[in-house]
Amino acid sequence: QLARPTVALITNAGEAHLAGLGSVAAVARAKGEIFSGLQHDGIAVINADDAYAGLWRQLAAPHRCLTFGMDHPADVSAECTLAITGSVVRLKTPQGEIDMRLSLLGKHNVMNALAAAGASIAAGVKLDDIRKGLEKLKAMSGRLEIKPGIRGARILDDTYNANPSSLVAGVE
C-alpha cells in the first residue's frame, strides 16, 4: 500500500513461485492481489491467454482492464512470423496497428513484447515509441542466443537458467 501504481501487469501464473504457496491457483490469486493496490483510475493489464485471466479480471474490478494475447481475443494482439533470425510482428491495439521486427526469438518473447506494449499503452505511450523501444531489444547472453557453428550451422544457446519450461519455449 506504500506505492499505488497507475498500471499493474500480470504476465502469467506458473510453477516458478510454488514454494510457500502450494499450487498454481494460489500463485494466481497472490499475483492478482496487486490489483487491489491500483489507484482508483488505474489500469490492470492481463494476459488473455493465461488460464487465470478470468480470475484476474474479477480481482481487478472495478478498474479498467487491458488484455494482451495471441491465442484468445485481446485488446493488444499480434500477427507474427517466427524465424531463427527473430520475429516480424504486426501489433494490433486499440490505438491502431503497427509493424515491427523483433530480434528476440520465440513466441514467448512475442508475448513478452505484447505485455510490454499493453503496459505502455496503459501508461499513455505512443505506438511509434513502443515500436522503437521493442525493436531495440537484444537477447541476453545464454537466452535463446544464436551462435555460429561449424560448416554454417547455428547453435541456439539457452543455457542461462535452463529448465524444462525454457526448453519448450525455445522449441516454440
Regions found by a protein language model. Give the residues of each.
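AMP-binding/adenylate-forming catalytic core of the ANL superfamily
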Residues: 27, 161-172
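Amphipathic, non-transmembrane alpha-helical secondary structure
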Residues: 1, 32, 36, 168-172
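Acidic, Mg2+-coordinating active-site environments of NTP-dependent enzymes
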Residues: 4-154
